[in-house]
Amino acid sequence: MKYRLLVFDHDDTTVNSTATIHHPCFVRFLDAFYPGRSCTLEEYFLKNFSPGFVAMCHDEYGMDDAELEREAAFWREYVSTRVPKAYPGIREIMLRHRAEGGQIAVISHSYGDNILRDYRQNGLPEPDLVFGWEMPPDQRKPSPWPLQEVLRRTGLSPDEILVIDDLKPGYDMAMACGVPFAAAGWANDIPEIESFMRRFSRLYFKTVSALADYLFDEEGSL
């Protein structure tokens, strides 16, 4: 076993959710409360990559804290009846890792109860730890706090853990904690995102199967 604990991001790493749920939800929110404003799927991916969703809402759409609360409530209602599908192969990775004695954690910008629902609906093993959007803002990634808490609760050393994430906040969090990071490149083909992740991540995987090969094959695969 290369790593005793795998820390998964949720959206666009474990489940295909931005293109199918989160972006359509945001477009509906803009139509309802910011008529005339728009956001393409590529723009949504890029702004979530950097500077992040909250900064995008502040900077691009002028949302104050009250508007952010309204957007969050709109989003929470929208996702409550829509379950994203796990990427093919993710379930097999998690089941094999758990069967070999490994642990699974989730650090995400989705709410913890939605994450657990998605895991159940997709037949994924229940995570040992979940840190989601319900945490205070200063305890959400890219803050190192949730990963520091994983280290504290498990007693593992940084090199026994692998963070798997598709966006920069996860990378920044892992780097701040000295934890190995694997970039999940299977959600989109946006050059700016792929270029950054390939340049700065020692591990970059364009497919779920490539990640599985690295984790479980003796030789590993990049």
Regions found by a protein language model. Give the residues of each.
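N-terminal helical cap/lid subdomain that shapes the substrate entry/recognition surface
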Residues: 2-92, 99-100
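Residues within well-ordered alpha helices
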Residues: 29, 56-59, 96, 118, ...
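Surface-exposed alpha-helical segments enriched in charged/polar residues
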Residues: 31, 92-95, 99, 152, ...
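Asp-based, Mg2+/Mn2+-dependent phosphohydrolase catalytic module
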Residues: 1-4, 112, 116-222
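Substrate-recognition element of Asp-dependent hydrolases with the DxDx(T/V) motif
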Residues: 72, 90-122, 130-133
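Glycine-centered loop/turn motif at secondary-structure junctions
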Residues: 30, 34, 62, 98-101, ...
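Residue-level marker of regulatory loop/turn positions in helix-turn-helix DNA-binding domains and
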Residues: 86, 107, 139
